[in-house]
From Swiss-Prot:
Pfam families: Rhodanese, UPF0176_N. InterPro entries: Rhodanese-like_dom, Rhodanese-like_dom_sf, TrhO, TRHO_N. SMART domains: RHOD. The lineage of its organism: Eukaryota, Viridiplantae, Streptophyta, Embryophyta, Tracheophyta. Residues 245-368 form the Rhodanese domain. This is Rhodanese-like domain-containing protein 7.
Length: 474
């Protein structure tokens, strides 16, 4: 969901599972319905997708939607008083959380909501996280909240409960990531003596929680696109294969090129974008969005997506926009992208519920249409089926994933460059990177989360590992 980069060590997640917390009774979920038809409530019948009858969900049409909640909470003074009351309730808890009593857990979450008073929410949320020794990073914006936090389960659940006391933020989309037993076994700072119960091997290497104020919780750069008003149809992992195997469906990977390079779904289109804000222009160019009368002229050749042609034969009926199925790592980018496509005239827009991570967790490898590894924004760098840690490492010069083969390339220099950034860096930039790397290796005093810490051991290259094994066998 939310990207958290730092200078030297990315944070860590382990086994991911989706928290399926249903909305309160009689409340309206902005993600229900769409194209999934179930004939029973609470039964065991499998929901059936009816793709041709899919309709985008319009939140504004529901009397109990979040927009109605916003109207009810429009008084800024009342909102601030409500926040202060909730914050005071938590501040009355004077005892410290004994972080020795529970295992660490990481939860990524987001919610699109009309949240103009987001700035007033920053201080009480940050104070609570620090009080409960919850680390991580959170973004607040007029369009909602997006974050990833780490702490013992009790503390993390208290923070999430605090956030959802605001009716507009209730029903967070959550992905839980318990720390693996291996990471827990080597965790040095999971004790009450640690400021945030986060030591050298903690998933997040921050000395405090970062709560930032931004214009968007995920940057697209088009204010008129609002997932609050309408989004596409969510498709569960178990139904995803059926959808993307349909020859009439165009599958689009909404992630960036450094992510798609190491893995994607079979037959998926790669926009080759370097940032999510580039996605709108790619859609406009590739689908040749040009209105002719009341119909959109566009032709998508799935065999070669780069070739999009227009039929000049007036006798042939104009082609309409195709059915779209999109996916990303955890779901937030797809949700906003689906709103964009609906605003551009696309009628059938689907996206993978829970993202790639949920798919890799639930779908057996023998039935999977996923190829390669999935890039993640944490210390694992990549994951495979079953969410097992992947084989990729991270280039600290450009924050891109690199393979063992990439580390054998002449362009690779630890902490400086890799085959993907070597030609893009000037010699001056490389020298500065070498100086920083030397300073870090000798003193560990580079600013940020690793300031004052001794550096980790420089990883051996695959060649060195092979030589070491050969030497030990002689």
């Amino acid at each position: 969901m939310l990207r958290f980069y730092h200078w030297r060590f990315p944070p860590s997640l382990a086994v991911v599972r989706m928290l399926s917390s249903p909305p309160p009774p009689h409340s309206h979920s902005p993600f229900s319905g769409g194209g999934v038809n179930s004939n029973s409530v609470g039964g065991n019948s499998k929901p059936e997708l009816q793709f041709p009858q899919s309709q985008p969900h319009k939140l504004s049409s529901s009397p109990s939607s979040s927009l109605k909640s916003t109207v009810a909470c429009s008084n800024a003074g009342a909102i601030r008083r409500s926040m202060a009351t909730v914050s005071q309730a938590f501040s009355e808890r004077t005892e410290s959380i004994d972080s020795d009593l529970g295992s660490l857990v990481v939860v990524s979450f987001y919610k699109f909501a009309d949240f103009p008073e987001h700035a007033d929410f920053r201080k009480p949320l940050k104070d609570l996280c620090e009080k409960l020794r919850v680390s991580g990073g959170i973004i607040l914006a007029p369009e909602g909240i997006n974050g990833s936090i780490c702490g013992i389960r009790e503390s993390v659940e208290e923070v999430l409960a605090f956030i959802q006391r605001d009716v507009r933020l209730n029903g967070l989309r959550q992905v839980e990531t318990p720390v693996s037993p291996e990471q827990e076994a080597i965790h040095h700072g999971h004790s009450s003596s640690s400021p945030l119960a986060a030591g050298e091997d903690a998933p997040f290497r921050w000395d405090h929680v970062r709560v930032k104020l931004k214009k968007e919780i995920v940057t697209l750069g088009i204010p008129s696109v609002s997932p609050i008003e309408r989004v596409g149809t969510y498709v569960s992992p178990e139904e995803w294969n059926e959808l993307i195997s349909d020859p009439e469906t165009v599958v689009i990977d909404v992630r960036n090129t450094y992510e798609t390079r190491i893995g994607k779904f079979k037959g998926a289109v790669d926009p080759c974008t370097t940032a999510f804000r580039n996605f709108p222009s790619w859609v406009e160019n590739q689908f040749a969005l040009k209105q002719e009368g009341n119909e959109t002229q566009a032709k998508v050749e799935k065999e070669d997506f780069s070739e999009i042609t227009h039929k000049e034969d007036k006798a042939e009926k104009p082609k309409t926009l195709p059915r779209i199925a999109m996916y990303c790592t955890g779901g937030i980018r797809c949700e906003k992208a689906s709103s964009l496509l609906l605003s551009q005239g696309f009628e059938e827009v689907y996206h993978l519920k829970g993202g790639i991570l949920k798919y890799l967790e639930e779908v057996p490898k023998t039935e999977s249409l996923w190829e390669g590894e999935c890039f993640v924004f944490d210390k694992r760098v990549s994951v495979e089926h079953g969410l097992a840690q992947g084989t990729h490492k991270l280039c600290y010069g450009c924050k891109q994933p690199i393979s063992d083969e990439d580390m054998e390339a002449p362009e690779y220099e630890y902490g400086v460059s890799c085959p993907y950034c070597y030609s893009k860096k000037s010699e001056e930039e490389k020298e500065r990177a070498r100086a920083r790397q030397t300073q870090f290796e000798e003193w560990g005093v580079i600013g940020g989360p690793d300031k004052g810490r001794r550096p980790a051991t420089k990883p051996d290259s695959p060649r060195k590992k092979i030589n070491a094994k050969l030497g030990s066998s002689i």
